Amino acid sequence: LKKEGAVFIGKASMDELAMGGTNTTCYTGNAHNPWNTDRMTGGSSGGSAALVASGVVPMAIGSDTGDSVRKPAAFNGVVGVKPTYGRISRYGIIPYASSLDHVGYFTGNVEDACLTLEVLAGRDERDMTSSFRPVEEYSANLNSDMHGKKIAIISNVIEGIEKQDTKDAFYAVVEKLRARGAVVEEYSFNEDLMKAILPTYFIIANCEATSNHSNLDGIRFGVREDGADLQEIMTNSRTKGFGPLIRRRFVIGSYGLFEENQEKIFRKAQKVRRVIVEAMNACFKEYDAIIAPASGDIAPLLEGNTVETLSDEHIIAENYMAMANFSGGPSMTVPMGFKEECPLGLNITCNAWNEQTMFDIAKAIEEETGLKDLHAEVK
């Protein structure tokens, strides 16, 4: 970015260690949604999304391990992109879960999203997971003609959403894609697999995070607390140095990594991940992309928000986007409408290295809705 003349103005708020979906666990306090400051930005990269939505910057960087770029993009009315695993170097990023982590970013419109990826993508010898594949000219090749495109609607997500306003906004976009020549059809994944996405994500992510952050012991890295001996120093440091959400995730991760639990918890989750990816691959043999609302509703309230954690809306509709982290394929969110003066988002996911197709569909949606470069007036 610096090489291409970008000017950096600061760092954005984010959830602690990028673990969270609310941006309410940041050391500096809650991030507030610029469209309604009583509501969340989403997380973990919510601060970056809010800055683009406020018009402070045209582009901001984030990271996406489960949906940490794409969900805040939906809540803040901006474009959020998670490219293919390995498309952007992760050098310099503090890891959360290495097999799921992606560098992502936010922009105000699809064309800027194309240009940004052209700059950020490419091989980096400092990151062995970065790809040698040539970087495409996404912006020059941008084509919003939908004739010949075959798109699948994830019906499991639609069925899990309770708010009719969200469904209406989504299907209004679907009809516009059909009018442009796209074939858009309902597609059902195995319901048990869809319900397995969230627990599979939490097991893999928490186990990998526990390993990645084991050096934050107050001795080598991190906040140091006093203690009578080495064990007490480490215990106090890792207890007082992290918020309750992080401590809970580390406990879950440690449990999954116990020798006696690895096969039945961690490795089993990896096997389930593979089955989910195989189901996605089967879908992509028939379709160019899969789409669904990025969330069941507008951004939740910061106070008084209640979540039915066992509902299909929470288990499936609010957490299905981790599928793209499992597969490593490109996925992005674009604005699709408004409710109560707050934005709603639509997610597009494609097979690995099909960023151009993803951008083309996003551009068609943007042209039909007219929702681009949206800037909230913060009150």
Q: Where is each model-derived feature located?
A:
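General small-molecule cofactor/ligand-binding pocket signal
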Residues: 9, 183-190, 332
